[in-house]
Amino acid sequence: LNSDPPRRARVPVSFVLINSEHGSDESVIEALKGALSGEEGVEYEMQGVYGVYDIVLRLSSDDAARLRSIITNKVRRIGRVQSTLTMMVIEEQGS
């Protein structure tokens, strides 16, 4: 009898730090919501933050290649996004 809790299936997760033009945080967040809302099977959450970056975006999907495509073809192409820093979570590490 195994008393270890069952392992949850891991899905690819990315955190994207976004720099936007000064004063455009809210409009970028709204544009992100519009761009991502039609993506079936993709979960996301975002928040404006203080510091070097303006917005933190968390994306998850069952396909890492799809996440990369969304970041490249949707997130980075939103007007007023000046730069991004993407961190793909290493699925084999952590809890």
Regions inferred by a protein language model and the residue ranges of each:
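A compositional/biophysical signature of low hydrophobicity enriched in polar/charged and small residues
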Residues: 1-95
